[in-house]
A protein has these predicted regions:
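Conserved alpha/beta-hydrolase
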Residues: 41, 46-71
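Glycine-rich nucleophile elbow surrounding the catalytic serine of serine-hydrolase chemistry
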Residues: 107-117
Length: 188
């Protein structure tokens, strides 16, 4: 794995990595990780893909892994569309290095939503896409959730973590694991 940085569209430095196979590569796979994750969690998967001839590239979204700035976790400086543009920036960087190879993107969980926005914005940018661990919510619940988030953002600040929003979003995820020591045990 080779690590490097790109300038984020929303400001800051975007931590990236590329895994290259020992054999002749047959395609590029870009990974878009989920919420409360980082690219290091995908190292084994990237090496598995390498063993099958794939170049793998990924970035830590702003506020995640090696792209956390000033201790502010989970915050996309520039917002959602900036995170989508960061994925495009990584795509362009890697596609320029491997112009003859097919280009695939896999988005998992929150990464699947970023990928869905990406595909809507750039429908011809990739050859194949894998949308993993995605979801759908009732539009009324989504509107209510957005309202709660806006109110909490006004109360605690744009870059602060709201305990209420965290509990509403993830509170039930750990229930099936029994006694856990990590609020993110559900990610396993």
């Amino acid at each position: 794995m080779k690590e490097f940085y790109l300038d984020s569209c929303g400001g800051g430095r975007l931590h990236c990595a590329i895994w290259t196979p020992e054999s002749e590569p047959k395609a590029v796979v870009q990974l878009i990780h989920g919420i409360a994750e980082h690219i290091g969690r995908y190292d084994d998967f990237a090496r598995f893909l390498n063993a099958h001839g794939y170049v793998v590239a990924a970035d830590d979204h702003m506020g995640h892994g090696g792209s956390v700035e000033n201790g502010v976790k989970g915050y996309f400086s520039g917002g959602w569309l900036s995170a989508v543009e960061d994925e495009k920036r990584l795509h362009d960087e890697i596609a320029a290095q491997y112009p003859a190879l097919p280009y695939y993107i896999l988005g998992h969980s929150m990464g699947s939503f970023l990928l869905r926005t990406y595909l809507y914005t750039y429908p011809d940018a990739v050859d194949k896409a894998v949308i993993s661990g995605t979801g759908w919510e009732d539009p009324t619940k989504v509107r209510l959730g957005k309202l709660v988030c806006r109110l909490e953002q006004a109360r605690v600040g744009e870059t602060s973590t709201s305990k209420l929003v965290t509990k509403l979003m993830y509170g039930s995820y750990n229930k099936s694991f029994g006694a856990v020591t990590s609020p993110n045990a559900w990610i396993c």
